[in-house]
Amino acid sequence: MSTMSARDNEKGSARSQPSHAAASEIENVPRPSRQQSWTGTMIKVFIICACAGIVSKYIIPLDSIFKSVHIDPHDYATRANRILSTTPLIDGHNDLPYLIRLETKNKIYDHEKLPFRTGLLSHTDQIKIQEGKLGGQFWSVFVECATDPNAEIDDPTWAVRDTLEQIDVTKRLVQEYPDLLEYCESASCAKAAFKRGKVGSFLGIEGGHQIGNSLASLRQVYDLGVRYITVTHNCDNAFATAASTVAVGKPDLGLTDFGREFVKEMNRLGMLVDLSHVSHQTMRDILSVTKAPVMFSHSSSYALSKHLRNVPDDVLNGVTKNGGVVMVTFVPSFLKVDDPASATIHDAVDHILHVAKVAGWDHVGIGSDFDGTADVPEGLENVSKYPRLIELLLERGVTDEQARKLIGENILRVWSNVEEIAENIRALGEKPNEETWSGRKWTAAIDIPMPFMFKDSADKRKEL
C-alpha cells in the first residue's frame, strides 16, 4: 500500500474539493436511467463482439494471409515453404515401426538406445520430420508374409499377434512424443492436428495376411484405429493376387469372390482400400466393385517404369473415375526398373507429373516408403527432403494450388469421402459381413463334453 505526506494529502484534498456552485451544477446534471445504462452497456458489448468477429474472420486465419502474400514466382524455395506451412504434407507410407520391431524388439522408452529426438541413421526421426515439414503420416504396422513359399493361406501363423504388437508400439511411439505427434483416426483430426502444429499419425496395415484373411479380424483392427489395409503384400491371400506372384510367372487371377466381400466390408466400415502391392488385374477388379474411392499408398507409374508394383495408365484412368488417389513412392527400383542405382529425385518428379497428367491433379499424392527400402534416390535420402521435392515441382511449372492437392488435400478429400460413404451405408442398416473364406478350416475340441444347440450338431461338429 502506498503512503502520502500530510502536505500531499492537503494538496490532494484541496484539488479534490469542488466549489459550491460547481457542486450544485454537478448535482443538477441528469443522471442516466437504469434503462439508459443497460442500453449503453449492450451497445459496448455489441461493438466488442463485432470487433471480435472481424478479428476471427480476418486476423486469426493467418494461413489465409500467408497464402495471399505476394512472392516472386521464381523464388521456388519460399513458395515451397509457404505451401508446406499452410497445407499438411501427408505421406501415405512409412515403415519406421517395423525398424523399431527389428532393432529394439518394440522397446521405445530408453531414449539413448532409440534416439528419436536427436537422430537415427535411418530415414525418419524428429529432426528430419521438422526439417521436412511433414504434416501427417500413415505409419505402416507391417509384418511380413509367411517365410515358407509353400505355406497354405489358412496355415496358422503369428501374423495377427505381431500386427497387434505393431499397432501397440506405434500408438505408444506417438504418445511418447506428444509435442511432435498426434494420434488420429479421422480426416478431420488430421486437419486439426496440423493446425495445432502436430504431425497427425494414422495406422495402415500392409497386407490381408495380417488380419488372418478374416472379416471379423478386419472389424477388430478398425476398432483399434487402423484406417487403411493394403489388400495384399508380397503374397497371395484369400482376397486377391499379389503383384509379386505375377512377377514370378504365375497367373494373375485378380480379386477372389471373398475379396469382393472384403472390399464391401471395408466400404461399410469406412476403411481405405489400398491397392499398392496388388496385381494389375486385382487393381481393375477392385475399381469395378468398390463403392468408395481407393488409394495407392506407395506406388508409381508403370508407363515410366515397367515394374509390376506400379500403376498402368488404364488403372490411372479408373482412379480418376473412382475419385481415388495414387501416392507416388520413392523406391528406386519402382522409379527406374532398368537402372535403380541411377534413380534421383528428378525421377520421382517425373512419376508425379505423369500420374497427374493421366489421372489429374486431384488424384495424385506422396507415399515415400521411407524406412521400408534400404536404397533411396539421390536427393530423397530421408524425410527432410520433401521441401526440395516441392521446389523442383514448382520449377517444372506446377502451380501452388496443384502442389497443395498433391501433398495433402487429395488424400484428405479421399479419406473424408470414404468416411461419408460408410456413414451412408450404415444408415441404410447394412449389418457386418459374416462371410468367411471357402477354404477356411474350422477346428473344434470335440473330445470335450459340451451341450448341443441343435439335433444334428453331433455330425456337424465332426465335420469341422
Swiss-Prot record:
<keyword id="KW-1015">Disulfide bond</keyword>
<feature type="glycosylation site" description="N-linked (GlcNAc...) asparagine">
    <location>
        <position position="382"/>
    </location>
</feature>
<keyword id="KW-1133">Transmembrane helix</keyword>
<dbReference type="GO" id="GO:0070573">
    <property type="term" value="F:metallodipeptidase activity"/>
</dbReference>
<feature type="transmembrane region" description="Helical">
    <location>
        <begin position="40"/>
        <end position="56"/>
    </location>
</feature>
<feature type="binding site">
    <location>
        <position position="298"/>
    </location>
    <ligand>
        <name>Zn(2+) 2</name>
    </ligand>
</feature>
<keyword id="KW-0812">Transmembrane</keyword>
<dbReference type="InterPro" id="IPR000180">
    <property type="entry name" value="Dipep_AS"/>
</dbReference>
<feature type="binding site">
    <location>
        <position position="309"/>
    </location>
    <ligand>
        <name>substrate</name>
    </ligand>
</feature>
<keyword id="KW-0482">Metalloprotease</keyword>
<feature type="binding site">
    <location>
        <position position="233"/>
    </location>
    <ligand>
        <name>substrate</name>
    </ligand>
</feature>
<keyword id="KW-0472">Membrane</keyword>
<keyword id="KW-0325">Glycoprotein</keyword>
<feature type="binding site">
    <location>
        <position position="277"/>
    </location>
    <ligand>
        <name>Zn(2+) 2</name>
    </ligand>
</feature>
<dbReference type="Pfam" id="PF01244">
    <property type="entry name" value="Peptidase_M19"/>
</dbReference>
<comment type="similarity">
    <text>Belongs to the metallo-dependent hydrolases superfamily. Peptidase M19 family.</text>
</comment>
<dbReference type="InterPro" id="IPR032466">
    <property type="entry name" value="Metal_Hydrolase"/>
</dbReference>
<keyword id="KW-0862">Zinc</keyword>
<keyword id="KW-0645">Protease</keyword>
<keyword id="KW-0479">Metal-binding</keyword>
<feature type="region of interest" description="Disordered">
    <location>
        <begin position="1"/>
        <end position="34"/>
    </location>
</feature>
<keyword id="KW-0378">Hydrolase</keyword>
<dbReference type="GO" id="GO:0046872">
    <property type="term" value="F:metal ion binding"/>
</dbReference>
<feature type="disulfide bond">
    <location>
        <begin position="145"/>
        <end position="235"/>
    </location>
</feature>
<feature type="binding site">
    <location>
        <position position="95"/>
    </location>
    <ligand>
        <name>Zn(2+) 1</name>
    </ligand>
</feature>
<keyword id="KW-0224">Dipeptidase</keyword>
<feature type="binding site">
    <location>
        <position position="206"/>
    </location>
    <ligand>
        <name>Zn(2+) 2</name>
    </ligand>
</feature>
<comment type="function">
    <text>Hydrolyzes a wide range of dipeptides.</text>
</comment>
<dbReference type="GO" id="GO:0006508">
    <property type="term" value="P:proteolysis"/>
</dbReference>
<protein>
    <recommendedName>
        <fullName>Putative dipeptidase CPC735_014430</fullName>
        <ecNumber>3.4.13.19</ecNumber>
    </recommendedName>
</protein>
<dbReference type="InterPro" id="IPR008257">
    <property type="entry name" value="Pept_M19"/>
</dbReference>
<feature type="binding site">
    <location>
        <position position="93"/>
    </location>
    <ligand>
        <name>Zn(2+) 1</name>
    </ligand>
</feature>
<feature type="binding site">
    <location>
        <position position="369"/>
    </location>
    <ligand>
        <name>substrate</name>
    </ligand>
</feature>
<feature type="binding site">
    <location>
        <position position="206"/>
    </location>
    <ligand>
        <name>Zn(2+) 1</name>
    </ligand>
</feature>
<dbReference type="GO" id="GO:0016020">
    <property type="term" value="C:membrane"/>
</dbReference>
